[in-house]
Swiss-Prot record:
This is Translational regulator CsrA. The keyword Ligase does not apply. It is found in: Cytoplasm. It comes from Leptospira borgpetersenii serovar Hardjo-bovis (strain JB197). Keywords: Bacterial flagellum biogenesis, Cytoplasm, Repressor, RNA-binding, Translation regulation. Belongs to the CsrA/RsmA family. Its main location: cytoplasm. InterPro entries: CsrA (IPR003751), CsrA_sf (IPR036107). Pfam families: CsrA.
Length: 84
């Protein structure tokens, strides 16, 4: 792990297009800003772990393609029963 010291308003570059800026430092809390292209996902570590866990659970779901068709039929019947 690379460890760098930075002060408020100083930054770190990752590659050519990701910039990490130290926005504020108060006590033991550091606020950072991340400038990155829209196609780069940026998450806090605890949120990222939750996303990974949900993706893992979704990948393990054992839904068969024919079951998806049945769900579609049920939704169509439900929608056709609505009054507009």
């Amino acid at each position: 792990m690379l460890v760098l010291a930075r002060r408020t308003n100083e930054s770190i570059m990752i590659g050519d297009d990701i910039e990490i800026v130290i926005v504020d430092i108060k006590g033991d809390q550091v606020k950072i800003g991340v400038k990155a292209p829209r196609n780069v996902s940026v998450h806090r570590a605890e949120v990222y772990k939750d996303i990974q866990e949900e993706n893992r659970k979704a990948a393990e779901t054992k839904i068969k393609p024919e079951d998806l068709g049945k769900i579609g039929d049920i939704l169509k019947k439900k929608d056709s029963g609505k009054k507009g």
